[in-house]
Amino acid sequence: MPAKSGGVNIPVNARKTADTACIQRITLYPIKSLDGVSVAETRIAPGGSLEHDRAFAVVDAQDKFVNGKRFAEVHRLRAHFDLDTHTVTLADSGMSAPQGFRLDRDLERMEAWMSTFFGFSVTIRQDPRAGFPDDTDASGPTVISAATLATVSAWFPGATPQDMQLRFRTNLEISGVSAFWEDRLFGEPGTLVDFNVGTVAFEGVNPCQRCVVPARHPRSGIEESGFQKTLAMRREQTLPAWAARSRFNHYYRLAVNTRIPPSEAGKTLRVGDEVTILGVRRANDE
């Protein structure tokens, strides 16, 4: 049966391609704004996020996020996670001895360590149900293709696809498709793109608006002059025909924001799962 948008039937295969899109990498960011960890599989949390993704967040005395947008020092903070043992090891880019913490019982000690690192008092919040997404209207994982990361890295001398993955901090990386294939996962304003990843239902919402963080070196925090301008210019020049250009009030956008319906809670995403586009519908056609 065709999907519907604005009363007009849109063939389900209108957005399908000959490519076989599969999940190549799943990256979780257990503490918002800190380093990620790659996993082979993850479950869907009750609030529609990936389990463990941004389940913790560091906030200041005004209860505002301590993140890379506000504090470049975040980029110097290294975090290594072992989700099986609920542990994180923190270090100041090798300048101090690494310190290990249990995420299930050492939060006060970790708050003290981070307060010393930042030079002001911080608190660690926890929300295992929904996490702390930047976009609360599209709180699912962000999606990008490996080919996109490779193409974008070529726009910046000396950069690699891994550099771009660290800068853009996406959750799901897709292989087997061309650059900017993920732009098929959103439609015109007021629409959603239904797609499946394995057995998990997704809704593609919009192209992800980027902040200052990708313009900074992911380890030093030093801002790269002209990064935002170059990315926006090249995105506009290379925007594929299948992308809904009306969603770009500016072109400093990369990757796709998604939602996962409540019905999918508890299901599992795995590396190797196929991504299948089902069709486009109006956002209010539930």
Language-model features, listed with the residues they occupy:
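Metal-cofactor-dependent catalytic cores
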Residues: P2-E286
